[in-house]
A protein has these predicted regions:
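Conserved beta-propeller blade signature
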Residues: 57-63, 104-107, 154-158, 207-211, ...
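Surface loop/turn motifs at the tips and blade-to-blade linkers of beta-strand repeat domains
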Residues: 39-44, 86-91, 132-139, 188-192, ...
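Beta-strand-rich domains and repeat architectures in extracellular enzymes and scaffolds
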Residues: 38-66, 272-279, 295-296
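Blade-level signature of beta-propeller repeat domains, shared across WD40, Kelch, NHL, RCC1
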Residues: 345-369
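Asp-box/WD-like beta-propeller blade repeats and closely related beta-sheet repeat scaffolds
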Residues: 99, 111-150, 158-162, 185, ...
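Short loop/turn segments immediately following the C-termini of beta-strands
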Residues: 65-67, 110-112, 118, 160-162, ...
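Hydrophobic core register within WD40 beta-propeller blades
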Residues: 49, 98, 147, 196-199, ...
Length: 369
């Protein structure tokens, strides 16, 4: 009887996903030749994605959310098709960020980091949360955050400025923190970071790269969003004094010269709301994509003509950015957006997942040789 129930559940999931795909105009998405996009799963308010345990039989993807207050687990098989979607946490305050380490799921919830142990063995009856830390700032303005473990084993946690533009305590806000997995030993890794969301480590060097969202109310085309490179601790990236490496802030810029700070590795378009980013480490895509950066641009809210709502590609030569271009676009139709990319993640088969919190979807981009 249980085998019949499982088969019925998988059939219903396939039917519901097929029907949902018909409701989303995926034919509008423009990709380079040879690429294709499909609906992979429906997940309410999907934000950061983190890959759990996986092997040749399948694995688990964890997905955070904002307004939904939930964390989902997506179980997929050897063919990388989703078999089940399970809510593993709910009722949390903006549990946007998710990270996985040694069988445990870590979740950010504004001022707190929570841990769910032995999670994949307990998806049907998730464990109680263990408090890792509750000492992060409680402001919700830029208070939600992605999280991830670095190559040094530390948990990295961006803490945004609690404002559009202000001069906050640099030990408390506008920085990127790192701490031990148990929450001990927190330290500021990078300063002058207004609102970083996505970050990843370059495969060849192990060095940190991250997106940062520029301030508002300086017009349609300034300041730029930023892609930054932090090869070592202690660097300052300019906020609130300097934006984009060369634009002095009209309120705070007189206090420091832009020359005092680290300029972005790549200026991104103004107000695109650059969120999740990942280095492409797969082998499915052509070789020229290997170790390049994909960025989910959530899209503008404060511009006379909307911009963003796409996935972009930053091409690198070593550790130098040499090009910034659209990779997947079409979620914006004129001034109407039907989707908003929020994160990207490379599956073990080399396909690229794109989370969309507006459409409540996760897409899968594949390359057909």
């Amino acid at each position: 009887m249980r085998r019949i129930d499982i088969r019925l559940g998988l059939a219903l999931l396939l039917i519901s996903t097929t029907l949902a795909a018909a409701e989303l105009p995926l034919e509008r998405i423009k990709l380079p030749p040879g690429f294709a996009i499909e609906l992979w799963a429906r997940v309410d308010n999907a934000r950061q994605m983190a890959l759990g345990h996986h092997d040749d039989k399948g694995g688990t993807l964890f997905v955070g959310s904002m307004q939904a207050g939930k964390v989902h687990a997506l179980s997929f098989g050897a063919n990388f098709r989703v078999q089940a979607v399970t809510v593993v946490a709910s009722g949390l305050q903006r549990p946007v960020g998710v990270a996985y380490r040694d069988g445990s799921l870590y979740v950010s919830a504004v001022s707190r980091i929570l841990r769910y142990d032995d999670i994949e063995r307990r998806l049907a009856q998730p464990p109680a949360a263990v408090l890792v830390t509750d000492r992060l700032p409680g402001e919700t303005h830029h208070g939600w955050k992605f999280i991830a473990f670095g190559p040094d084993g530390k948990l990295y946690v961006p803490v945004g400025a609690p404002c559009n533009i202000c001069e906050p305590d640099p030990q408390r806000h506008a920085n990127i923190l790192r701490m031990n997995a148990d929450g001990s030993g927190p330290e500021v890794y990078a300063r002058g970071v207004r609102n970083s969301v996505g970050f990843d480590w370059q495969p060849q060097t192990g060095e940190l790269w991250f997106t940062d969202n520029g301030r508002d109310l300086l017009g349609d085309d300034r300041p730029p969003d930023e892609l930054n490179h932090a090869p070592r601790a202690g660097m300052h990236f300019g906020f609130p004094y300097c934006h984009g490496g060369n634009l002095a802030d009209p309120e705070f810029g007189a206090r420091h010269s832009c020359a005092e700070f680290t300029a972005p590795a790549q200026q991104l378009s103004a107000h695109v709301a650059s969120l999740g980013m990942r280095f492409y480490t797969g082998t499915m895509f052509p070789p020229e994509y290997r170790n390049q950066i994909f960025i989910a641009e959530h899209g503008s809210w404060n511009r006379s003509r909307k911009i963003g709502y796409r996935v972009t590609l930053v091409r690198l030569q070593g550790s130098k950015a040499i090009a910034y271009e659209a990779f997947a676009s079409g979620w914006l139709n004129g001034e109407n957006a039907w989707g908003r990319p929020s994160d990207v993640l490379v599956l073990p088969d080399g396909s690229l997942l794109v989370a969309d919190d507006h459409a409540g979807a996760i897409y899968r981009i594949i390359y057909r040789r």
